[in-house]
Protein backbone atom coordinates (compact mmCIF):
# COMPACT_ATOMS: atom_id res chain seq x y z
CA UNK A 1 0.00 0.00 0.00
CA UNK A 2 1.33 3.43 -0.94
CA UNK A 3 2.24 5.91 1.79
CA UNK A 4 -0.37 8.33 0.46
CA UNK A 5 -3.10 5.69 0.74
CA UNK A 6 -2.03 4.85 4.28
CA UNK A 7 -2.16 8.53 5.25
CA UNK A 8 -5.71 8.81 3.86
CA UNK A 9 -6.77 5.77 5.90
CA UNK A 10 -5.25 7.25 9.04
CA UNK A 11 -6.98 10.53 8.34
CA UNK A 12 -10.35 8.81 7.92
CA UNK A 13 -10.07 6.85 11.17
CA UNK A 14 -8.74 9.84 13.11
CA UNK A 15 -11.47 12.16 11.83
CA UNK A 16 -14.17 9.61 12.63
CA UNK A 17 -12.82 9.19 16.16
CA UNK A 18 -12.56 12.95 16.67
CA UNK A 19 -16.08 13.52 15.36
CA UNK A 20 -17.51 10.75 17.52
CA UNK A 21 -15.83 11.78 20.80
CA UNK A 22 -15.48 15.52 20.27
CA UNK A 23 -11.75 15.62 20.93
CA UNK A 24 -8.44 14.75 19.29
CA UNK A 25 -7.97 10.98 19.61
CA UNK A 26 -5.04 9.25 21.22
CA UNK A 27 -2.50 7.97 18.72
CA UNK A 28 -2.97 4.43 20.02
CA UNK A 29 -6.68 4.45 19.23
CA UNK A 30 -6.07 5.41 15.61
CA UNK A 31 -3.15 3.03 15.17
CA UNK A 32 -5.17 0.19 16.71
CA UNK A 33 -8.04 0.75 14.30
CA UNK A 34 -5.67 0.91 11.34
CA UNK A 35 -3.76 -2.25 12.23
CA UNK A 36 -6.98 -4.05 13.15
CA UNK A 37 -8.47 -3.45 9.71
CA UNK A 38 -5.17 -3.82 7.83
CA UNK A 39 -3.06 -6.42 9.67
CA UNK A 40 -0.54 -6.45 6.84
CA UNK A 41 0.69 -3.08 8.15
CA UNK A 42 1.61 -4.40 11.62
CA UNK A 43 5.30 -4.95 10.78
CA UNK A 44 5.47 -1.23 9.93
CA UNK A 45 3.78 0.07 13.10
CA UNK A 46 6.77 2.17 14.23
CA UNK A 47 7.12 3.76 10.80
CA UNK A 48 3.46 4.77 10.87
CA UNK A 49 3.65 6.76 14.13
CA UNK A 50 5.07 9.98 12.57
CA UNK A 51 2.24 9.94 10.02
CA UNK A 52 -0.33 9.42 12.77
CA UNK A 53 1.16 12.25 14.87
CA UNK A 54 1.10 14.61 11.87
CA UNK A 55 -2.55 13.82 11.10
CA UNK A 56 -3.54 14.28 14.75
CA UNK A 57 -1.72 17.61 14.91
CA UNK A 58 -3.66 18.83 11.88
CA UNK A 59 -6.96 17.68 13.38
CA UNK A 60 -6.08 19.44 16.64
CA UNK A 61 -6.33 22.76 14.82
CA UNK A 62 -9.76 22.03 13.36
CA UNK A 63 -13.15 22.91 14.82
CA UNK A 64 -15.82 20.24 15.22
CA UNK A 65 -17.66 21.61 12.18
CA UNK A 66 -14.46 21.46 10.12
CA UNK A 67 -13.86 17.88 11.26
CA UNK A 68 -17.36 16.89 10.19
CA UNK A 69 -17.01 18.66 6.84
CA UNK A 70 -13.67 17.00 6.09
CA UNK A 71 -14.95 13.56 7.09
CA UNK A 72 -18.04 14.05 4.92
CA UNK A 73 -15.75 14.93 2.04
CA UNK A 74 -13.35 11.97 2.18
CA UNK A 75 -15.42 9.26 3.92
CA UNK A 76 -19.15 10.05 4.11
CA UNK A 77 -19.87 6.40 4.89
CA UNK A 78 -18.11 6.80 8.25
CA UNK A 79 -20.44 9.69 9.15
CA UNK A 80 -23.38 7.49 8.27
CA UNK A 81 -21.95 4.65 10.35
CA UNK A 82 -22.06 6.88 13.43
CA UNK A 83 -25.45 8.43 12.78
CA UNK A 84 -27.38 5.25 11.98
CA UNK A 85 -28.24 3.13 14.98
CA UNK A 86 -27.47 -0.42 13.99
CA UNK A 87 -29.95 -3.03 15.19
CA UNK A 88 -27.60 -5.67 16.51
CA UNK A 89 -30.08 -6.71 19.15
CA UNK A 90 -30.85 -10.37 18.92
CA UNK A 91 -33.87 -9.89 21.10
CA UNK A 92 -35.94 -12.69 22.57
CA UNK A 93 -37.22 -15.71 20.66
CA UNK A 94 -41.02 -16.08 20.58
CA UNK A 95 -42.72 -18.13 23.25
CA UNK A 96 -44.70 -21.26 22.47
CA UNK A 97 -48.26 -20.21 23.27
CA UNK A 98 -50.01 -23.16 21.63
CA UNK A 99 -51.02 -24.61 25.01
CA UNK A 100 -52.89 -21.51 26.17
CA UNK A 101 -56.62 -21.80 26.68
CA UNK A 102 -58.99 -19.14 25.28
CA UNK A 103 -58.64 -15.98 27.36
CA UNK A 104 -55.62 -17.30 29.27
CA UNK A 105 -52.82 -14.76 29.61
CA UNK A 106 -49.14 -15.46 29.26
CA UNK A 107 -47.90 -15.39 32.87
CA UNK A 108 -44.26 -15.45 33.92
CA UNK A 109 -42.51 -15.08 37.23
CA UNK A 110 -39.18 -14.24 38.79
CA UNK A 111 -38.64 -16.19 41.99
CA UNK A 112 -35.71 -14.81 44.00
CA UNK A 113 -34.62 -15.74 47.48
CA UNK A 114 -34.65 -12.39 49.33
CA UNK A 115 -31.41 -12.98 51.24
CA UNK A 116 -29.83 -9.87 49.72
CA UNK A 117 -30.45 -7.27 47.00
CA UNK A 118 -30.68 -8.31 43.32
CA UNK A 119 -27.42 -8.90 41.52
CA UNK A 120 -26.72 -8.43 37.84
CA UNK A 121 -27.62 -12.10 37.39
CA UNK A 122 -30.99 -11.58 39.08
CA UNK A 123 -31.54 -8.56 36.84
CA UNK A 124 -31.42 -10.86 33.82
CA UNK A 125 -34.33 -12.89 35.17
CA UNK A 126 -36.32 -9.78 36.07
CA UNK A 127 -35.78 -8.13 32.70
CA UNK A 128 -36.34 -11.14 30.43
CA UNK A 129 -39.48 -12.34 32.22
CA UNK A 130 -40.89 -8.82 32.31
CA UNK A 131 -40.10 -8.28 28.64
CA UNK A 132 -41.91 -11.46 27.65
CA UNK A 133 -44.93 -10.48 29.72
CA UNK A 134 -45.09 -7.13 27.93
CA UNK A 135 -44.54 -8.71 24.50
CA UNK A 136 -47.65 -10.85 25.00
CA UNK A 137 -49.71 -8.37 27.06
CA UNK A 138 -49.36 -10.82 29.90
CA UNK A 139 -48.61 -10.87 33.62
CA UNK A 140 -45.25 -10.53 35.38
CA UNK A 141 -45.13 -11.87 38.95
CA UNK A 142 -42.42 -11.40 41.54
CA UNK A 143 -42.59 -14.34 43.91
CA UNK A 144 -40.23 -14.60 46.85
CA UNK A 145 -39.07 -18.17 47.43
CA UNK A 146 -38.37 -17.49 51.10
CA UNK A 147 -39.06 -20.84 52.72
CA UNK A 148 -35.52 -21.54 53.94
CA UNK A 149 -35.20 -19.67 57.26
CA UNK A 150 -31.99 -21.46 58.24
CA UNK A 151 -29.44 -21.83 55.43
CA UNK A 152 -30.55 -19.01 53.10
CA UNK A 153 -32.21 -16.80 55.67
CA UNK A 154 -34.23 -13.96 54.12
CA UNK A 155 -33.49 -10.30 54.88
CA UNK A 156 -36.52 -8.17 55.65
CA UNK A 157 -35.06 -5.22 53.68
CA UNK A 158 -34.51 -7.39 50.61
CA UNK A 159 -38.24 -7.77 49.92
CA UNK A 160 -38.47 -4.02 49.38
CA UNK A 161 -35.13 -3.83 47.57
CA UNK A 162 -36.23 -6.33 44.94
CA UNK A 163 -39.45 -4.50 44.14
CA UNK A 164 -37.76 -1.08 44.09
CA UNK A 165 -34.88 -2.23 41.92
CA UNK A 166 -37.23 -4.00 39.51
CA UNK A 167 -39.11 -0.71 39.13
CA UNK A 168 -35.82 1.15 38.60
CA UNK A 169 -34.93 -1.34 35.86
CA UNK A 170 -38.22 -0.45 34.18
CA UNK A 171 -39.76 -3.83 35.09
CA UNK A 172 -42.46 -3.24 37.72
CA UNK A 173 -44.14 -6.50 38.77
CA UNK A 174 -47.89 -6.84 38.28
CA UNK A 175 -48.14 -8.93 41.43
CA UNK A 176 -45.84 -9.56 44.41
CA UNK A 177 -46.13 -12.74 46.48
CA UNK A 178 -44.09 -14.14 49.38
CA UNK A 179 -44.19 -17.91 49.75
CA UNK A 180 -43.75 -17.60 53.53
CA UNK A 181 -47.21 -15.99 53.70
CA UNK A 182 -48.87 -18.98 52.04
CA UNK A 183 -47.91 -22.02 54.11
CA UNK A 184 -51.56 -22.99 54.86
CA UNK A 185 -52.02 -23.47 51.09
CA UNK A 186 -49.03 -25.82 50.96
CA UNK A 187 -50.24 -27.76 54.01
CA UNK A 188 -53.64 -28.21 52.37
CA UNK A 189 -52.11 -29.65 49.20
CA UNK A 190 -49.72 -31.83 51.19
CA UNK A 191 -52.69 -33.37 52.98
CA UNK A 192 -54.38 -34.08 49.64
CA UNK A 193 -51.28 -35.96 48.55
CA UNK A 194 -51.19 -37.87 51.84
CA UNK A 195 -54.86 -38.85 51.38
CA UNK A 196 -54.05 -40.03 47.84
CA UNK A 197 -51.23 -42.19 49.19
CA UNK A 198 -48.70 -40.15 47.23
CA UNK A 199 -46.85 -38.63 50.20
CA UNK A 200 -45.67 -40.16 53.46
CA UNK A 201 -43.92 -39.16 56.66
CA UNK A 202 -40.45 -40.67 56.92
CA UNK A 203 -38.55 -40.86 60.21
CA UNK A 204 -35.52 -42.69 58.86
CA UNK A 205 -32.08 -41.47 59.80
CA UNK A 206 -30.63 -39.47 56.88
CA UNK A 207 -27.78 -41.91 56.28
CA UNK A 208 -30.08 -44.92 56.45
CA UNK A 209 -32.46 -43.45 53.89
CA UNK A 210 -29.56 -42.41 51.66
CA UNK A 211 -28.26 -45.97 51.56
CA UNK A 212 -31.73 -47.36 50.81
CA UNK A 213 -32.29 -44.78 48.09
CA UNK A 214 -28.97 -45.51 46.43
CA UNK A 215 -29.85 -49.20 46.44
CA UNK A 216 -33.30 -48.48 44.97
CA UNK A 217 -35.03 -49.96 48.02
CA UNK A 218 -38.06 -48.47 49.84
CA UNK A 219 -37.81 -47.32 53.43
CA UNK A 220 -40.05 -48.97 56.07
CA UNK A 221 -42.44 -45.99 56.10
CA UNK A 222 -43.22 -45.95 52.37
CA UNK A 223 -46.28 -48.17 52.63
CA UNK A 224 -47.68 -46.63 55.80
CA UNK A 225 -51.48 -46.20 55.35
CA UNK A 226 -52.67 -42.63 54.56
CA UNK A 227 -54.55 -42.32 57.84
CA UNK A 228 -51.45 -43.13 59.87
CA UNK A 229 -49.37 -40.78 57.71
CA UNK A 230 -51.90 -38.03 58.38
CA UNK A 231 -51.49 -38.54 62.12
CA UNK A 232 -47.72 -38.29 61.80
CA UNK A 233 -48.12 -35.19 59.61
CA UNK A 234 -50.29 -33.53 62.23
CA UNK A 235 -47.67 -34.45 64.81
CA UNK A 236 -45.04 -32.71 62.67
CA UNK A 237 -47.18 -29.56 62.50
CA UNK A 238 -47.78 -29.66 66.26
CA UNK A 239 -44.07 -29.80 67.07
CA UNK A 240 -44.09 -33.44 68.10
CA UNK A 241 -40.84 -34.19 66.27
CA UNK A 242 -37.41 -32.66 66.66
CA UNK A 243 -35.49 -30.83 63.96
CA UNK A 244 -34.30 -33.79 61.86
CA UNK A 245 -36.60 -36.51 63.15
CA UNK A 246 -39.21 -36.45 60.39
CA UNK A 247 -39.77 -35.30 56.80
CA UNK A 248 -42.65 -35.59 54.35
CA UNK A 249 -41.63 -37.34 51.14
CA UNK A 250 -43.31 -37.44 47.74
CA UNK A 251 -43.75 -41.00 46.57
CA UNK A 252 -42.14 -41.33 43.12
CA UNK A 253 -40.31 -44.28 41.55
CA UNK A 254 -37.96 -45.81 44.09
CA UNK A 255 -36.14 -47.57 41.24
CA UNK A 256 -35.78 -44.46 39.07
CA UNK A 257 -32.47 -44.40 37.18
CA UNK A 258 -31.66 -41.06 38.81
CA UNK A 259 -31.43 -41.42 42.61
CA UNK A 260 -32.29 -37.71 43.02
CA UNK A 261 -35.80 -38.50 41.74
CA UNK A 262 -36.44 -41.23 44.30
CA UNK A 263 -38.99 -40.19 46.94
CA UNK A 264 -37.71 -36.66 47.38
CA UNK A 265 -38.35 -34.50 50.45
CA UNK A 266 -41.28 -32.08 50.23
CA UNK A 267 -41.32 -30.75 53.83
CA UNK A 268 -38.82 -30.67 56.66
CA UNK A 269 -38.78 -29.28 60.21
CA UNK A 270 -36.94 -25.99 60.81
CA UNK A 271 -37.03 -24.62 64.34
CA UNK A 272 -35.14 -21.41 63.57
CA UNK A 273 -37.45 -18.35 63.48
CA UNK A 274 -38.33 -16.86 60.10
CA UNK A 275 -37.68 -13.10 59.69
CA UNK A 276 -41.27 -12.55 58.47
CA UNK A 277 -43.34 -15.12 60.31
CA UNK A 278 -41.27 -15.69 63.43
CA UNK A 279 -42.04 -19.03 65.10
CA UNK A 280 -45.56 -19.35 63.68
CA UNK A 281 -44.46 -22.23 61.42
CA UNK A 282 -41.86 -24.91 61.92
CA UNK A 283 -42.69 -27.25 59.01
CA UNK A 284 -41.34 -25.67 55.84
CA UNK A 285 -41.65 -26.80 52.22
CA UNK A 286 -38.59 -27.53 50.13
CA UNK A 287 -38.17 -25.30 47.09
CA UNK A 288 -39.29 -27.97 44.61
CA UNK A 289 -42.63 -28.38 46.41
CA UNK A 290 -43.26 -24.70 47.11
CA UNK A 291 -42.39 -23.68 43.57
CA UNK A 292 -44.64 -26.37 42.10
CA UNK A 293 -47.55 -25.12 44.20
CA UNK A 294 -47.06 -21.47 43.37
CA UNK A 295 -46.61 -21.96 39.64
CA UNK A 296 -49.98 -23.72 39.59
CA UNK A 297 -51.97 -21.40 41.86
CA UNK A 298 -50.51 -18.23 40.34
CA UNK A 299 -51.39 -19.45 36.86
CA UNK A 300 -47.81 -19.39 35.57
CA UNK A 301 -47.80 -20.47 31.92
CA UNK A 302 -44.10 -20.16 31.09
CA UNK A 303 -41.04 -20.79 33.26
CA UNK A 304 -37.51 -19.73 32.35
CA UNK A 305 -34.92 -21.36 34.58
CA UNK A 306 -31.25 -22.31 34.51
CA UNK A 307 -30.31 -25.52 32.74
CA UNK A 308 -28.80 -26.69 36.03
CA UNK A 309 -32.41 -27.03 37.24
CA UNK A 310 -33.57 -29.32 34.44
CA UNK A 311 -34.39 -32.06 36.96
CA UNK A 312 -36.76 -29.74 38.80
CA UNK A 313 -39.54 -30.23 36.26
CA UNK A 314 -39.18 -34.01 36.42
CA UNK A 315 -39.59 -33.91 40.20
CA UNK A 316 -42.53 -31.53 40.14
CA UNK A 317 -44.39 -33.39 37.41
CA UNK A 318 -45.06 -36.20 39.88
CA UNK A 319 -47.13 -33.77 41.95
CA UNK A 320 -48.87 -32.35 38.89
CA UNK A 321 -49.87 -35.82 37.70
CA UNK A 322 -51.14 -36.83 41.14
CA UNK A 323 -53.28 -33.68 41.45
CA UNK A 324 -54.40 -33.58 37.81
CA UNK A 325 -52.67 -30.32 36.95
CA UNK A 326 -51.04 -29.17 33.70
CA UNK A 327 -47.35 -28.33 33.95
CA UNK A 328 -46.21 -24.93 32.57
CA UNK A 329 -44.04 -24.64 29.48
CA UNK A 330 -40.36 -24.57 30.49
CA UNK A 331 -37.36 -22.96 28.77
CA UNK A 332 -33.81 -23.26 30.04
CA UNK A 333 -30.88 -20.94 29.73
CA UNK A 334 -27.18 -21.45 30.31
CA UNK A 335 -25.04 -20.00 33.02
CA UNK A 336 -23.67 -16.48 32.71
CA UNK A 337 -20.08 -16.10 33.84
CA UNK A 338 -19.48 -12.49 34.79
CA UNK A 339 -15.93 -11.62 33.77
CA UNK A 340 -14.11 -9.08 35.88
CA UNK A 341 -15.96 -9.79 39.12
CA UNK A 342 -14.85 -13.28 40.03
CA UNK A 343 -17.26 -15.58 41.86
CA UNK A 344 -19.79 -13.68 43.93
CA UNK A 345 -22.75 -15.25 45.69
CA UNK A 346 -25.10 -13.31 47.93
CA UNK A 347 -23.76 -15.15 50.97
CA UNK A 348 -20.15 -14.35 50.01
CA UNK A 349 -21.00 -10.67 49.52
CA UNK A 350 -22.83 -10.55 52.84
CA UNK A 351 -19.85 -12.05 54.69
CA UNK A 352 -17.56 -9.52 53.00
CA UNK A 353 -19.76 -6.63 54.09
CA UNK A 354 -19.92 -7.92 57.66
CA UNK A 355 -16.12 -8.30 57.67
CA UNK A 356 -15.64 -4.73 56.47
CA UNK A 357 -14.22 -5.75 53.09
CA UNK A 358 -16.98 -3.82 51.32
CA UNK A 359 -18.73 -0.56 52.23
CA UNK A 360 -22.16 -2.08 51.74
CA UNK A 361 -24.33 -3.67 49.08
CA UNK A 362 -23.68 -0.63 46.85
CA UNK A 363 -19.90 -1.00 46.97
CA UNK A 364 -18.63 -0.58 43.38
CA UNK A 365 -16.63 -3.79 43.74
CA UNK A 366 -19.89 -5.77 43.85
CA UNK A 367 -22.11 -6.83 40.92
CA UNK A 368 -25.35 -5.72 42.58
CA UNK A 369 -27.98 -3.61 40.86
CA UNK A 370 -27.76 -0.98 43.60
CA UNK A 371 -23.98 -0.73 43.11
CA UNK A 372 -24.37 -0.27 39.36
CA UNK A 373 -27.07 2.34 39.95
CA UNK A 374 -24.83 4.30 42.30
CA UNK A 375 -22.02 4.18 39.75
CA UNK A 376 -24.25 5.76 37.11
CA UNK A 377 -25.13 2.74 34.99
CA UNK A 378 -28.47 3.43 33.30
CA UNK A 379 -31.31 0.90 33.62
CA UNK A 380 -31.84 1.06 29.86
CA UNK A 381 -28.26 -0.14 29.32
CA UNK A 382 -28.79 -3.13 31.63
CA UNK A 383 -32.08 -3.97 29.91
CA UNK A 384 -30.57 -3.80 26.44
CA UNK A 385 -27.64 -6.03 27.35
CA UNK A 386 -29.79 -8.65 29.07
CA UNK A 387 -32.30 -8.82 26.23
CA UNK A 388 -29.50 -9.06 23.70
CA UNK A 389 -28.26 -12.20 25.48
CA UNK A 390 -31.50 -13.90 24.52
CA UNK A 391 -32.61 -17.23 25.96
CA UNK A 392 -30.26 -20.04 25.04
CA UNK A 393 -28.89 -23.08 26.81
CA UNK A 394 -25.39 -22.07 25.76
CA UNK A 395 -23.24 -20.80 28.64
CA UNK A 396 -22.26 -17.15 28.20
CA UNK A 397 -19.16 -15.26 29.26
CA UNK A 398 -20.29 -11.71 29.93
CA UNK A 399 -17.75 -8.91 30.08
CA UNK A 400 -18.58 -5.72 31.93
CA UNK A 401 -17.10 -3.93 28.92
CA UNK A 402 -20.26 -4.91 27.04
CA UNK A 403 -22.41 -3.16 29.63
CA UNK A 404 -20.06 -0.18 29.70
CA UNK A 405 -20.25 0.19 25.92
CA UNK A 406 -24.06 0.12 26.04
CA UNK A 407 -24.14 2.62 28.88
CA UNK A 408 -21.68 4.91 27.10
CA UNK A 409 -24.14 5.24 24.20
CA UNK A 410 -26.68 6.62 26.65
CA UNK A 411 -24.58 8.84 28.92
CA UNK A 412 -22.07 10.22 26.42
CA UNK A 413 -24.55 12.62 24.74
CA UNK A 414 -25.80 13.82 28.15
CA UNK A 415 -22.66 14.01 30.27
CA UNK A 416 -21.04 17.42 30.69
CA UNK A 417 -17.25 17.52 30.53
CA UNK A 418 -14.95 18.68 33.32
CA UNK A 419 -11.31 18.41 34.31
CA UNK A 420 -10.26 16.19 37.20
CA UNK A 421 -6.61 15.99 38.24
CA UNK A 422 -5.80 12.79 40.17
CA UNK A 423 -2.75 12.93 42.45
CA UNK A 424 -2.13 16.59 41.58
CA UNK A 425 1.37 18.01 41.16
CA UNK A 426 2.09 21.76 40.98
CA UNK A 427 3.42 23.13 37.69
CA UNK A 428 4.72 26.69 38.07
CA UNK A 429 4.26 28.52 34.75
CA UNK A 430 6.53 31.52 34.20
CA UNK A 431 5.79 34.37 31.83
CA UNK A 432 2.11 33.53 31.43
CA UNK A 433 -0.41 36.38 31.10
CA UNK A 434 -3.78 36.47 32.81
CA UNK A 435 -5.94 34.15 30.72
CA UNK A 436 -9.57 33.06 30.66
CA UNK A 437 -9.84 29.50 29.42
CA UNK A 438 -13.09 28.62 27.69
CA UNK A 439 -14.14 25.02 27.15
CA UNK A 440 -17.50 23.59 26.02
CA UNK A 441 -19.61 21.70 28.52
CA UNK A 442 -20.09 19.21 25.71
CA UNK A 443 -17.94 19.12 22.57
CA UNK A 444 -20.88 18.27 20.31
CA UNK A 445 -23.44 20.59 21.88
CA UNK A 446 -22.09 24.11 22.21
CA UNK A 447 -25.60 25.41 22.90
CA UNK A 448 -25.24 23.86 26.31
CA UNK A 449 -22.70 26.52 27.23
CA UNK A 450 -19.06 26.81 28.20
CA UNK A 451 -16.92 26.51 31.29
CA UNK A 452 -14.84 29.62 31.88
CA UNK A 453 -11.77 29.34 34.09
CA UNK A 454 -9.77 32.43 35.01
CA UNK A 455 -6.03 31.81 35.30
CA UNK A 456 -3.75 34.39 36.95
CA UNK A 457 -0.40 35.60 35.67
CA UNK A 458 2.47 33.18 36.25
CA UNK A 459 0.09 30.68 37.84
CA UNK A 460 0.57 27.49 39.76
CA UNK A 461 -1.28 24.88 37.74
CA UNK A 462 -2.18 21.42 39.01
CA UNK A 463 -1.61 18.53 36.60
CA UNK A 464 -1.80 14.74 37.09
CA UNK A 465 1.21 13.15 38.75
CA UNK A 466 1.41 10.60 35.93
CA UNK A 467 1.95 13.42 33.42
CA UNK A 468 4.30 15.32 35.73
CA UNK A 469 6.47 12.25 36.28
CA UNK A 470 6.96 11.84 32.54
CA UNK A 471 7.69 15.52 31.84
CA UNK A 472 11.32 16.34 31.04
CA UNK A 473 13.00 19.72 30.47
CA UNK A 474 12.34 20.71 26.88
CA UNK A 475 9.04 18.81 26.64
CA UNK A 476 6.00 20.77 25.54
CA UNK A 477 2.67 20.30 27.30
CA UNK A 478 -0.59 21.51 25.84
CA UNK A 479 -2.79 22.49 28.79
CA UNK A 480 -6.14 21.66 27.24
CA UNK A 481 -8.19 24.72 26.25
CA UNK A 482 -5.59 27.01 27.90
CA UNK A 483 -2.09 27.40 26.40
CA UNK A 484 1.27 25.73 25.81
CA UNK A 485 4.09 25.27 28.31
CA UNK A 486 7.71 24.22 27.73
CA UNK A 487 9.06 22.33 30.75
CA UNK A 488 12.18 23.95 32.24
CA UNK A 489 12.62 22.05 35.51
CA UNK A 490 11.54 18.80 37.10
CA UNK A 491 12.01 19.30 40.85
CA UNK A 492 10.05 21.44 41.43
CA UNK A 493 8.13 21.22 38.15
CA UNK A 494 8.42 24.49 36.24
CA UNK A 495 7.75 25.67 32.71
CA UNK A 496 7.66 28.69 30.44
CA UNK A 497 4.57 30.02 28.73
CA UNK A 498 5.08 29.66 24.95
CA UNK A 499 1.76 30.88 23.57
CA UNK A 500 -1.37 29.22 22.32
CA UNK A 501 -0.33 27.89 18.92
CA UNK A 502 -1.93 24.49 18.30
CA UNK A 503 0.81 23.59 15.86
CA UNK A 504 2.82 22.32 18.85
CA UNK A 505 0.73 19.18 18.54
CA UNK A 506 2.66 18.41 15.36
CA UNK A 507 5.80 18.35 17.48
CA UNK A 508 4.30 15.69 19.73
CA UNK A 509 3.08 17.97 22.52
CA UNK A 510 1.01 16.04 25.04
CA UNK A 511 -2.49 17.26 25.87
CA UNK A 512 -2.98 17.46 29.65
CA UNK A 513 -6.01 18.30 31.79
CA UNK A 514 -5.43 20.81 34.57
CA UNK A 515 -6.97 22.85 37.38
CA UNK A 516 -5.67 26.02 39.02
CA UNK A 517 -4.57 25.77 42.61
CA UNK A 518 -7.23 28.30 43.62
CA UNK A 519 -10.03 27.17 41.31
CA UNK A 520 -10.54 23.53 42.20
CA UNK A 521 -12.47 21.45 44.68
CA UNK A 522 -11.09 18.35 46.49
CA UNK A 523 -12.59 15.28 44.86
CA UNK A 524 -12.58 11.59 45.70
CA UNK A 525 -13.52 8.96 43.12
CA UNK A 526 -14.50 5.48 44.35
CA UNK A 527 -14.21 2.72 41.78
CA UNK A 528 -14.20 -1.08 41.55
CA UNK A 529 -10.39 -1.10 41.49
CA UNK A 530 -9.74 1.40 44.27
CA UNK A 531 -9.96 5.10 45.07
CA UNK A 532 -8.58 8.18 43.35
CA UNK A 533 -7.98 11.47 45.14
CA UNK A 534 -7.49 14.76 43.39
CA UNK A 535 -8.85 18.18 42.45
CA UNK A 536 -11.68 18.89 40.02
CA UNK A 537 -13.24 22.01 38.57
CA UNK A 538 -15.48 23.80 41.05
CA UNK A 539 -18.47 23.67 38.71
CA UNK A 540 -18.92 19.95 39.27
CA UNK A 541 -20.72 21.01 42.44
CA UNK A 542 -23.64 21.81 40.13
CA UNK A 543 -23.80 18.19 38.94
CA UNK A 544 -25.12 16.38 42.02
CA UNK A 545 -26.50 12.93 41.04
CA UNK A 546 -25.47 13.46 37.42
CA UNK A 547 -23.03 11.44 35.35
CA UNK A 548 -20.24 13.63 33.96
CA UNK A 549 -17.06 12.89 32.07
CA UNK A 550 -13.77 13.74 33.69
CA UNK A 551 -11.73 14.31 30.54
CA UNK A 552 -8.84 11.90 30.03
CA UNK A 553 -10.03 9.96 33.08
CA UNK A 554 -13.51 8.38 33.02
CA UNK A 555 -17.24 8.90 33.32
CA UNK A 556 -18.28 9.31 36.95
CA UNK A 557 -21.47 9.96 38.88
CA UNK A 558 -21.38 12.86 41.36
CA UNK A 559 -22.72 11.26 44.52
CA UNK A 560 -22.36 13.71 47.39
CA UNK A 561 -21.00 17.21 47.93
CA UNK A 562 -19.87 17.96 51.45
CA UNK A 563 -16.67 19.96 51.33
CA UNK A 564 -15.05 17.13 49.38
CA UNK A 565 -16.92 16.01 46.28
CA UNK A 566 -17.54 12.26 46.28
CA UNK A 567 -17.91 10.63 42.87
CA UNK A 568 -18.41 7.02 41.85
CA UNK A 569 -16.53 5.60 38.89
CA UNK A 570 -18.92 4.67 36.07
CA UNK A 571 -16.63 3.37 33.31
CA UNK A 572 -13.95 4.62 30.90
Curated annotation (Swiss-Prot):
One of its GO terms (cellular component) is cytosol. The keyword Acyltransferase does not apply. Its EC number is 6.1.1.17. It catalyses: tRNA(Glu) + L-glutamate + ATP = L-glutamyl-tRNA(Glu) + AMP + diphosphate. Pfam families: tRNA-synt_1c (PF00749), tRNA-synt_1c_C (PF03950), tRNA-synt_1c_C2 (PF20974). The keyword Amino-acid biosynthesis does not apply. It is an enzyme of class 6 (ligase). It is found in: Cytoplasm. A motif ('HIGH' region) lies at residues 112-122. Gene3D superfamilies: 2.40.240.100, HUPs, Ribosomal Protein L25, Chain P. GO terms for molecular function: ATP binding; glutamate-tRNA ligase activity. Keywords: Aminoacyl-tRNA synthetase, ATP-binding, Cytoplasm, Ligase, Nucleotide-binding, Protein biosynthesis. One of its GO terms (biological process) is glutamyl-tRNA aminoacylation. Belongs to the class-I aminoacyl-tRNA synthetase family. Glutamate--tRNA ligase type 2 subfamily. PANTHER family: GLUTAMATE--TRNA LIGASE (PTHR43097:SF5), GLUTAMINE-TRNA LIGASE (PTHR43097). Catalyzes the attachment of glutamate to tRNA(Glu) in a two-step reaction: glutamate is first activated by ATP to form Glu-AMP and then transferred to the acceptor end of tRNA(Glu). This is Glutamate--tRNA ligase. The gene is gltX.
